[in-house]
Every structure is written in C-alpha cells, then in structure tokens.
Amino acid sequence: MTHQKRLSVPKSWKVGRKGNKWISTTRPGPHSQARSLPLGLIIRDVLKLVDNNREGKRILSEGKVLVDGISRKDLRFPVGLFDVITLPLVNEAYRMLQDEKGRLVLYKLNETNVNKLCRINNKTTVKGGKIQLNLNDGTNILGSNDYGTKDSLILSIPDKHVVKHLKFEVGNLAMVIGGQHSGETGKIMEIREVKSSRHNTVMISGETDFETIEDYVIVIGEDKPEIRLGGEISE
C-alpha cells in the first residue's frame, strides 16, 4: 500500500487530520512506519518546500534534499528519529526528534556540518571473526567488543566514522523514545536487570524522577547532550 487515509496515520506523525484524504506511507527501510515520516510528506507538509508530489519528485531527483548526507530520491523514503535532513542550496539542516507527546518533529539546526547519534541495538560476528555493530537506523558498521549493546555512537555523516562512544551506564544522559515519558531527557540513576521474561528497567532523573523500560532509553551524552535538542520547530 503506497497511500493511507490521513485519519489513520500513526500517532507519531504530527500531521493535521484535515487536508487531502490520502497520504503517502513510508517504504520499508531503515525505520518502521510507526517511527518515521515519508520524505515526501516532510518536504511538502512540514518544510513546505513544494506544493505537491510532482514538485517533490523534481527537487528530489535534482539532489536538493539529503538525509544523513546522502541524496534521497524516493518520496516514500522513511526519515526517523535522529536523522538529519540537509538542504544544501539554502544552507539549512534539521534533526528529527520527538516531542513530549511522542510525535516526530523536525528541529532546525544552527549549522549544516553536524553529526548523527545512533544506538547499538545488537552485535553480530561476521566473516573473519569481526564484530558488526547493528544500529537503530539500520546502519551496520564494523567495531569491537569495546562497544556494548545499547551504547550510543556519534557518527560523522555521510561516511559514518565513529566520532564518540557513549556508554549505556549510570550517570550518563539519556532520552526516552517510547511510553508515557517519550521525549523526556534526564540522567540515568539506576539500571535494573530483571531475571525473567519482563523488560529491564531504567530509573531516570530529569524534571521528575521516573522509571521506564530499557528499550525506550537512548544515551545522548555524558555531562551534556552531544546533539542539539532544542531550537526552532518546523511544523
């Protein structure tokens, strides 16, 4: 299915319920539909660079829109959490984050030469005994056992070299990306390992103290966030 009714879009999509009856879906890719927006919707309804999909196809085909430093030409390409959209011709860049309601929003950045934050979802051993790090945005890079599952990496884009390694440990700063505290940030106070089928949990101290499941937590820094979290929101 390439389109869905506007009224049935995922709750994470911050789009009006009024307007065209049908709206594009995301194509299968690095992010799930629930955690991403189609690039065509972003350039038309969010950034308002075009008025319709025909104009959108044209500017994408001309390489005027980059996602994580790579020209993307598919209107249905999924743009997800922490992805960076760059518009070289107007020297602007935006990062996809979540608001307090768990909706995906674009924050305008002060510069276009920025890095990307990713979480290590798991690790696998590949040919030659090398360690492959499988990241939350679908990226796979070679690493070592020094990197742990649920650690975060700051990557340069588009070449994806590791700029900084952030450990998933007590004392580091984290963002919550799911549940009732989605979009909140704070310091990791405790990681509680549960020896059962239930999820491990994490105690976070931010504006309030709260507990959330481990899978919802992404480390974003040590003493301070490694990525810009605030700024102008594009709506």
UniProtKB/Swiss-Prot annotation:
Keyword Cell membrane set for record: no
Annotated S4 RNA-binding domain residues: 37-110
GO CC terms in record: cytosolic small ribosomal subunit
Keywords: Ribonucleoprotein, Ribosomal protein, RNA-binding, rRNA-binding
SS bond partners: none
Keyword Transcription: no
Gene3D superfamilies given in the database record: 2.30.30.30, 2.40.50.740, RNA-binding S4 domain (3.10.290.10)
Entry superkingdom: Archaea
InterPro entries reported for this sequence: KOW (IPR005824), Rib_uL2_dom2 (IPR014722), Ribosomal_eS4 (IPR000876), Ribosomal_eS4_central_region (IPR013845), Ribosomal_eS4_central_sf (IPR038237), Ribosomal_eS4_KOW (IPR041982), Ribosomal_eS4_N (IPR013843), Ribosomal_eS4_N_CS (IPR018199)
Protein name per Swiss-Prot or TrEMBL: Small ribosomal subunit protein eS4
